């Protein structure tokens, strides 16, 4: 299981400060929509210059098929090692993205976004008129058939997804509160033990790391517990 540290801070200087504190550790860094819109593709290079970190560019691309393919081709060429697209864009869109990226010499990992971990059952049903777990498994099957590398889901869907697709189909699970920290705006959260027992391939941890007094210490503690 790999740790992905979410850099959802107020400015690039703060993000880079945390990245420097994590230098030498076996972690991925997650750059979200706010940071990318604010700091641009040069920020990816700045992070890689700190320690050649692997970068998950979390933009959750969602549009018509050709626009998604165009966008993913662009962001695949700026140094991102993993990107994500919304499964709810549909089979045609996901096929279009993978067909386009297959032409690149070195494409990033591509994950589907299933149900955001800010959803609970009631709020998800209001939008999709369906149950979370059934929908996520359905999204995962279609994503797997389209050739994506994995899916973003909650810890609680990870095993069901692997059973429905393949043990090699990656699950990246946000909403991780390693040692019982506050849920904040997340609904479907889990601790490290639950993530490990559900065979998450990547866990995403943000605020418990970057809001701590010693980000490196808490990161080392997490790595110790998952390796």
Swiss-Prot record:
InterPro entries, alphabetized: Aldolase_TIM, OMPdecase, OMPdecase_AS, OMPdecase_bac, OMPdeCOase_dom, RibuloseP-bd_barrel
SUPFAM superfamilies: Ribulose-phoshate binding barrel
GO biological process annotation, one example: 'de novo' pyrimidine nucleobase biosynthetic process
PROSITE patterns, per the entry: OMPDECASE (PS00156)
Catalytic residues in the record: 60
UniProt superkingdom: Bacteria
Metabolic or biological pathway, per its Swiss-Prot or TrEMBL entry: Pyrimidine metabolism; UMP biosynthesis via de novo pathway; UMP from orotate: step 2/2
Example of a GO MF term: orotidine-5'-phosphate decarboxylase activity
Cellular component terms per the entry's GO annotation: cytosol
Binding site for substrate: 8, 30, 58-67, 117, 177, 186, 206-207
Enzyme Commission (EC) number: 4.1.1.23
UniProt similarity note: Belongs to the OMP decarboxylase family. Type 1 subfamily.
Binding partners and assembly: Homodimer.
NCBIfam families: PRK00230.1, pyrF
Name of the protein described by the UniProt record: Orotidine 5'-phosphate decarboxylase
């Amino acid at each position: 299981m790999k740790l992905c540290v979410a850099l959802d801070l107020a400015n690039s200087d703060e993000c880079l400060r945390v990245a420097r504190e994590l230098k030498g550790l076996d972690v991925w860094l997650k750059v979200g929509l706010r940071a990318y819109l604010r700091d641009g593709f040069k920020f990816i290079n700045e992070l890689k210059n700190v320690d050649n970190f692997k970068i998950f560019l979390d933009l959750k691309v969602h549009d018509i098929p050709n626009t998604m393919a165009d966008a993913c081709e662009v962001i695949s060429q700026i140094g991102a090692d993993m990107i994500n697209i919304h499964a709810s864009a549909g089979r045609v869109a996901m096929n279009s993205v993978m067909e386009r990226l297959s032409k690149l010499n070195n494409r990033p990992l591509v994950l589907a976004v299933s149900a955001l971990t800010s959803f609970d059952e009631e709020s998800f049903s209001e939008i999709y008129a369906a149950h979370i777990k059934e929908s996520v498994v359905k999204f995962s099957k279609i994503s797997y058939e389209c050739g994506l590398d994995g899916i973003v889901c909650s810890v609680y869907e990870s095993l069901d997804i692997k059973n429905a697709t393949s043990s090699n189909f990656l699950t990246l699970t946000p909403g991780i509160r390693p040692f019982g920290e506050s849920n904040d705006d997340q609904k479907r959260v889990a601790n490290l033990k639950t993530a490990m027992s559900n065979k998450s391939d990547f866990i995403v941890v943000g605020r418990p790391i970057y809001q701590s007094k010693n980000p490196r210490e808490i990161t080392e503690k997490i790595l110790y517990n998952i390796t």
